[in-house]
Regions:
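Non-catalytic accessory segments flanking enzymatic or RNA/DNA-binding domains
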Residues: 1-108
Length: 108
């Protein structure tokens, strides 16, 4: 189980980070905060059995607005739709659970 998160930065309005952690989101924020001049804050996160796949799907969805290192210049509408996008992609990942090749890759 892991979490895909959406973070903001008070110093960079309109820029958001889509990332992943298998641990605690707050600890991840503290780690990212080191060396960052602004204040990073949590907007939302989504728990999933497939955190890295979900993160990749989100990065692909928003690749046209990626600025650097998993940071994206997003509109308020895109930020507001983050949770819904996660849910939609999770449905796709859930449907793949029974696919032989997907199951083989994701054995626990």
């Amino acid at each position: 189980m892991g979490k895909v998160y959406l973070l903001g930065d008070w110093a960079k309005e309109g820029y958001y980070k889509i990332g992943v952690t298998k641990g605690d989101v707050e600890k991840r924020i503290k780690k990212l905060q080191t060396g960052n001049g602004g204040e990073i804050y949590l907007i939302s996160y989504f728990e999933t059995d497939f955190p890295f796949e979900l993160e990749k799907m989100l990065h692909n969805r928003y690749q046209h607005i990626e600025t650097h290192n998993e940071w994206f210049e997003m509109t308020n509408e895109e930020v507001g739709g983050f949770q819904k996008a996660c849910e939609e992609f999770q449905e796709s990942l859930d449907a793949l659970r029974e696919n032989y090749f997907f199951k083989k890759k994701h054995k626990k």
